[in-house]
């Protein structure tokens, strides 16, 4: 069983009667059973990702209505454990432009469907390296940053601040383990030392005992400049800062966080996007919202420039070295031709302010400085 909801035909101005070019987009989502966490202060929004797609459709239709382009967005949301490929087959009958919000294995299963050959798919949720390397697919582009881009951004900041020695605390969930591995690779890449590691194994409520338990947990660490936290499920990281044995900054999944988007980004016209999103969703924009927004804006830019909704035509345009689009992050966004990853600055933020945008000044690249973040062409098996 799966649920299909017509989310939006047009959020903004209705398409004129003479519209000749329909552009049908589907958002495929595999819902997730979230593991229990210590705090519910920041619940995951039910419309995470979807809300970003909705405002992107509104933004895109504003221009499209003048050109005879009519955009529509359909949401197919599958309960946890359901079969997203069944919904994908149904969606591909009427839409050849698909956003996928799912785990890496499910994304690949959709991309490999016979019905998906010739379609254009956008991964808006998974930062897994294999999707950009050995398991890349010609019909799959990525607007969510890869984990390696986020961790590379963080290590550039640590290197710039000369915080050379770190320790690492890793949670028990697969997403935590994957992020920890990305942190290790990035640390090696940028010459940052991880002097010691510990696994987070507590399964009791620490909210009333953090001042006792966290110092004991971190007391045995050798001297360090920063505590790295791999806690992608938002379970324990918030309790490490200000409770550790040594007074050190926290970075990674909590503290100083590398992310695609955050509510503290204010420059480069970002406030306009933030305000439009909050007016629509009644909450701040998150990274997955931004990835969905970027995917539809990329589609809209390609349709506007080519006058076509053909997936092959749009893909060729998006992968052209001359393609750029504005992403409200100070640099033009473009796609890497070798693995379909959207090049984008990574915001390194704390809960109240933007620390910086990576790539950090001084980290150079022969082609594009944003290629210092994540898998560069020689590193990808794509």
Tell me what each language-model feature is.
Residues 2-8, 18-382:
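Extracytosolic ligand-binding ectodomains
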């Amino acid at each position: 069983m799966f649920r299909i909801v017509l989310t939006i035909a047009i959020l903004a101005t209705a398409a004129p009667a003479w519209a000749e070019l329909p552009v049908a987009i589907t958002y495929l989502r595999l819902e997730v059973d979230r593991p229990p966490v210590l705090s519910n202060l920041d619940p995951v929004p039910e419309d995470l990702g979807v809300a970003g797609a909705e405002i992107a459709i509104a933004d895109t239709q504003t221009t499209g209505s003048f050109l005879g382009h009519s955009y529509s967005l359909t949401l197919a949301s599958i309960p946890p454990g359901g079969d997203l490929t069944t919904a994908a087959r149904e969606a591909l009958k009427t839409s050849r432009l698909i956003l996928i919000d799912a785990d890496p294995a499910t994304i690949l299963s959709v991309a490999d469907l016979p019905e998906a050959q010739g379609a254009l798919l956008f991964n808006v949720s998974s930062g897994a390296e294999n999707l950009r390397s050995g398991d890349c697919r010609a019909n799959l582009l990525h607007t969510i940053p890869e984990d390696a881009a986020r961790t590379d951004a963080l290590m550039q900041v640590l290197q710039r601040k000369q915080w050379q020695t770190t320790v690492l605390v890793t949670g028990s969930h697969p997403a935590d383990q994957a992020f920890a591995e990305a942190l290790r690779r990035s640390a090696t890449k940028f010459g940052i030392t991880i002097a010691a590691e510990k696994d987070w194994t507590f399964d009791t409520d620490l909210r009333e005992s953090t001042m006792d338990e966290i110092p004991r947990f971190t007391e045995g660490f050798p001297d360090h400049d920063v505590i790295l936290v791999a806690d992608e499920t938002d379970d324990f990281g918030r309790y490490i800062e200000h409770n550790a044995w040594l007074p050190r900054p926290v970075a990674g999944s909590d503290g100083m966080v590398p992310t695609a988007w955050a509510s503290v980004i204010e420059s480069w016209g970002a406030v306009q996007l933030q305000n439009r999103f909050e007016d629509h969703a009644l909450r701040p924009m998150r990274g997955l919202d931004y990835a969905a927004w970027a995917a539809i804006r990329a589609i809209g830019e390609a349709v506007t420039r080519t006058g076509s909704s053909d997936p092959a035509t749009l893909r060729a345009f998006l992968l052209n070295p001359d393609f750029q689009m504005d992403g409200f992050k100070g640099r033009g966004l473009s796609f890497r031709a070798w693995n379909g990853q959207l090049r984008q600055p990574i915001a390194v933020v704390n809960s109240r302010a933007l620390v910086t945008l990576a790539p950090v000044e001084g980290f150079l690249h022969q082609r594009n400085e944003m290629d210092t973040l994540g898998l560069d062409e020689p590193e990808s098996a794509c």
